[in-house]
Curated annotation (Swiss-Prot):
Subcellular localization: Periplasm
Pfam families the UniProt entry points to: HlyD_3, PilZ
Encoding gene, per UniProt annotation: alg44
UniProt record similarity statement: Belongs to the Alg44 family.
Protein name per the record: Alginate biosynthesis protein Alg44
InterPro entries: MFP, PilZ_domain
Domain PilZ: 17-117
GO MF terms held by the record: cyclic-di-GMP binding
CC per GO annotation: periplasmic space
Top-rank taxon, per record: Bacteria
Organism: Azotobacter vinelandii
Amino acid sequence: MNTATLNVNVVHESEAQRQHARVKLPGKIRFLGPNRETIEQRLIDISAGGFSFASGKPVTQQGAFHRGKLLFQLDSLGLAMDVEFQVRNLDPESGRTGCQFHGLGAREISTLRQMITSHLSGELVTVGDVICTLQRDNFTEGRARARAWPSRSMFERLRAVSFSLAIFIVGLGAFGLILKQLYDLYFVTHAESGMVSVPSMEVTMPREGTVQSLVGPDGLVANGAPIASFSASMLEMLKGHLSEEQLNPANVEKLFTRQMKGTLTSPCDCKVVAQRVADGQFASKGQVIFELLPRDAAATVEARFRYHDFAKVKPGTQVTFSVPGEDQPRRGRIVSTALQNEGLSSDIRVLIQPEQPLDSALAGQPVEVVIDHGPSYDWLIDKAVTAGL
């Protein structure tokens, strides 16, 4: 096995030293000597870390600090750069002096690097290149070092944790809202309108005359109970039954002045929901006087869907609807579907039978009807029942 002999005299440059390439740029250094005299020497080489010059005989001392100017000739213009440097090594015999820069600014470092890089690549350094280098920002700002967690106070830790928790909660809420909107968009069908419906009955005027209501303040009437009285002239009652001899002016006037009174009775145990003709007003024969609602009638829900949802509103489909004043939604099933007025239209009318009985007093109340055909526990049960499991 061959073993290499270690040479202890080899000096390895550091990373910082390897970054400073020494080049021979034509330039001069001008500074004040120990006796305040002006010293100007030609540069031997220069790098981004320092420079050297030879004066023949020592003009300064090792370790001394000086301020001066680096002078370069670019095109027909001179470039002077203020620098501070320290003498690091000095050869008494040849007068060669090596200096290190101190406190160089960003502009000076950028200019030196531009000149050194252009020289190494064989390019000519022009005034325009130097000006362009000085105009742009060649350095990035240092990253702000955050303080270590143990060095923070309890209040700062609590504030940081609270802020992170608040951001997390807001993000979680936004994510949940987006998921809900997507679910409603693809798995939920909303009815355009809906209301509680109860089959009603109408009481019409048997003869032409005036009407007077007999219904109490609560609007409740029993089957066969009088709900209104009416007055009609005898002439109206006998119209069509008198001969031409009986229709003389004297007889007509006599019959017209005579009034006949009658009553209207309730056909069921009902509640009066509307009175179409006010008390004392004249009503023609066949005109609707009262609209009655049977108290024992089962209330249903009528809803209107778009024709586009035709496949989703089939009879037997389970729906959910909400009634004003109730906290929990109710459930029901579609009993029948039909187009409006039994003709072609842009919407479908559906009749919904609630699973739990609805109070008939809710007749006419608006409801919100929703069909949820997305994955859920009930959806899994329905699928299992359909499959015969």
